[in-house]
Amino acid sequence: MPPFDVPEGDPFGPHNLPYGVFSIPGSSDGPNQPDGPDRTGRADRTGRADRTVGVRLGDHVLDVGAAAHALGSPYASLLARPTLNPLLAAGRTAWSDVRRALTAWVTVPSHREVLEPFFHPLSSVTLHLPFEVADYVDFYASENHARNVGQIFRPDAADSLTPNWKHLPIGYHGRSGTVVVSGTDVVRPSGQRKAPADAAPVFGPSVRLDIEAEVGFVVGVPSEPGSPVALGDFREHVFGLCLLNDWSARDVQAWEYVPLGPFLGKSFATSVSAWITPLDALEEARVAPPERTHELLPYLDDTDADQDGPGGYDLRISVALNGHVVSEPPFSTMYWTAAQQLAHMTVNGASLRTGDLYGSGTVSGSAERERGSLLELTWNGRDPLELPDGKRTFLEDGDVVTLSAWAPGPDGVRVGLGEVTGRVVGRGV
């Protein structure tokens, strides 16, 4: 099908236009890219210069740098790059201007002849990590998930939530160097683990490897050290979102996490989707977050009617294990919003950097079929999942996990959020 002939209702139509980075196998000079100063920058962590920014339309990707040069766009120098970081840093005005231009390019018939050479079938390209990750922070924002975890590990506690949970978004710093793009194999991690009945810890591969279905938020504009980012400034700093799988070794995590929290049980791999959906594509998906049950401190209080619209997002996530859907977590149930997480992350004066990534935390709904981790779905291994290819409590070598999602868009159409997939491999494979 020609690139412009996107079927009506396609979740990757002109209403969406997510950004990614791609290369064409066998091409070392970049797809349709000019030489010269506009090809500066680094691609991911590899320094590869054969990668370039693309925008998805249907089942094609548009080389937006080449298109911008051909059409004389003033933003060509931001787009003809091997990573999204220059565009991320350019700020909200540039983001809006580029999006308006892209929408016109792919919808106005007079542009077709110029742009058609710069479209490539998705089946013919390789997708890469779309931005250079600066810092990575992960949160714990789902009340359903937090209560489930509390009931599993603290069954005798008077309250399954910790005393601070309703007062602040709990989070921790992860490892940006182990953020990988969808399709990257995940090697089963090793570490210390100790079962309750064991006299001493042992070392070896994790036997309780899990996933966490999350949404990641990508920071564009940095902030000054010592200057907190207010709730109302969220959209001035955050460019868009992606799907995120926070792989977790539950046995390693359980032994190590007291008193400082997650470390080796989390730091070995975090997978993200290859497409970054700009916030401007998700206006129709904005919803009010769940009702607050505790009064919030002013820097987290989002009840002000003057705020820039509701802070929640109605994102419908699907979790598939070896091709079988096992859960459909609803992001609209998240207690803490991305804006509140950003405000809390910077309230002490910690600065933002272009390319910062922060995860929402595991997304879990109130129903059993809406839980976003195997820990919850199997209730810590007590209730195995019955799948066509056998039972599962935690992940086995060779298992493939795929998260996909969509959001409500204009006129009833869906906004596709792509997918993030990863295959578990044993060490030495």
Identify the residue ranges that each predicted region occupies.
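Active-site microenvironments in enzyme catalytic cores
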Residues: 1-25, 49, 56, 62, ...
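Short beta-strand/loop turn elements enriched in aromatics
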Residues: 311-333, 357-375
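Short beta-strand-to-coil "C-cap" segments at the C-terminal boundary of structured domains/repeats
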Residues: 221, 422-429
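Intrinsically disordered, low-complexity terminal tails and inter-domain linkers enriched
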Residues: 25-51
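Short, surface-exposed linear segments at secondary-structure transitions and domain or protein termini
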Residues: 335-346, 426-429
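Active-site pocket scaffolds in enzymes
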Residues: 339-343, 351-354, 358-406, 413-423
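A structural micro-motif recognizing beta-strand termini
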Residues: 23, 346-348
